[in-house]
Amino acid sequence: MAHKKGQGSTQNNRDSAGRRLGVKKFGSEFVRAGNIIVRQRGTKMHPGNNVGMGKDHTLYALTDGVVKFEYKDKSRKKVSVISQNFGE
């Protein structure tokens, strides 16, 4: 006969912390070069103009400007940064 009982509930009650994914800067929001715009797993959104992609598919701004979300085609989303020349 086993002399330990009730172990299942204590061994199974674990979970990993959330990964804090998602959009960090929203449409028409001002960003500086290097700001993270979207954290994602895989390319749910693709980089557009003035946006770079890291090795973990993070999208970030390459220049200062305003974020714009648009569709590349019917199914694929694209994120761009519209740079603004302030009185130059």
Curated annotation (Swiss-Prot):
One GO cellular component, as annotated: cytosolic large ribosomal subunit
The keyword Secreted is assigned to this record: no
One BP term from GO: translation
S-S pairs: none
Residue segments, region Disordered: 1-21
GO molecular function: structural constituent of ribosome
Protein keywords: Ribonucleoprotein, Ribosomal protein
Pfam families: Ribosomal_L27
Coiled-coil residue spans: none
InterPro entries membership: Ribosomal_bL27 (IPR001684), Ribosomal_bL27_CS (IPR018261)
Keyword Isomerase: no
Similarity remark: Belongs to the bacterial ribosomal protein bL27 family.
Protein name: Large ribosomal subunit protein bL27
